[in-house]
């Protein structure tokens, strides 16, 4: 398994890279989030990688953070989600945005990713439920998910509400609302339900 590549960035043409590592050029596909953070060609680059071995090819995927690579690994475990689709998901949203969409059961955010329809989004939410927040949201290098909606969700769960009830109530809370005000608004929404 090739877990990490360090070398000189020779070519970059989205989403493909060519990295020279002691005279050997590795073709690596990366999500756009990693691509945008790459140095200029001719500069040193280090990427965490995932090698996918298929019957007809050995494909190398690169990531700028452990959180991205871990998310990629979780995504490709899901039936019907291949490496290309996983790369599209990571290109369309950050790890923290994906974790939040899964936690809040927001299929609409997932369907904005090209190639993800309603059924695939629902499968992603079902399969990744409970995995992204615990595993990937706290992984080294992961962007912290400190959005007030997540804090409100955790508070409602601690009060004994189901994830579905809490997620529905949070949708009634305007974006940018503080945690304490958001909890009050969510509780009001739950009392009316």
Curated annotation (Swiss-Prot):
Residues 1-64 are annotated as: Domain I. It holds the Pfam family RuvA_C. InterPro entries: DNA_helicase_Holl-junc_RuvA_I, Hlx-hairpin-Hlx_DNA-bd_motif, NA-bd_OB-fold, RuvA, RuvA_2-like, RuvA_C, RuvA_C_sf. One of its GO terms (molecular function) is four-way junction helicase activity. The RuvA-RuvB-RuvC complex processes Holliday junction (HJ) DNA during genetic recombination and DNA repair, while the RuvA-RuvB complex plays an important role in the rescue of blocked DNA replication forks via replication fork reversal (RFR). RuvA specifically binds to HJ cruciform DNA, conferring on it an open structure. The RuvB hexamer acts as an ATP-dependent pump, pulling dsDNA into and through the RuvAB complex. HJ branch migration allows RuvC to scan DNA until it finds its consensus sequence, where it cleaves and resolves the cruciform DNA. Homotetramer. Forms an RuvA(8)-RuvB(12)-Holliday junction (HJ) complex. HJ DNA is sandwiched between 2 RuvA tetramers; dsDNA enters through RuvA and exits via RuvB. An RuvB hexamer assembles on each DNA strand where it exits the tetramer. Each RuvB hexamer is contacted by two RuvA subunits (via domain III) on 2 adjacent RuvB subunits; this complex drives branch migration. In the full resolvosome a probable DNA-RuvA(4)-RuvB(12)-RuvC(2) complex forms which resolves the HJ. This is Holliday junction branch migration complex subunit RuvA. The gene is ruvA.
């Amino acid at each position: 398994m090739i877990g990490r590549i360090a070398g000189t960035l020779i070519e970059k043409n989205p989403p493909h890279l060519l990295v020279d590592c002691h005279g050997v050029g590795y073709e690596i596909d990366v999500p756009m989030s990693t691509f945008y953070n790459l140095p200029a060609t001719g500069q040193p680059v280090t990427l965490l990688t995932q090698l996918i071995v298929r019957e007809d090819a050995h494909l190398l995927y690169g990531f700028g953070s452990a959180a991205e690579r871990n998310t990629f690994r979780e995504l490709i475990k899901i039936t019907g989600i291949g490496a290309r689709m996983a790369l599209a998901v990571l290109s369309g949203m950050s790890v923290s945005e994906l974790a939040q969409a899964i936690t809040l059961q927001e299929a609409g955010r997932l369907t904005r990713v090209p190639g993800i329809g309603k059924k695939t989004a629902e499968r992603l939410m079902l399969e990744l439920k409970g995995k992204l927040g615990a595993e990937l949201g706290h992984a080294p290098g992961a962007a912290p998910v400190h959005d007030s909606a997540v804090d409100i969700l955790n508070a409602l769960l601690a009060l004994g509400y189901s994830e579905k009830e809490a997620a529905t109530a949070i949708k009634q809370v305007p974006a940018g609302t503080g945690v304490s005000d958001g909890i009050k608004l969510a509780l009001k929404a739950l009392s009316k339900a």
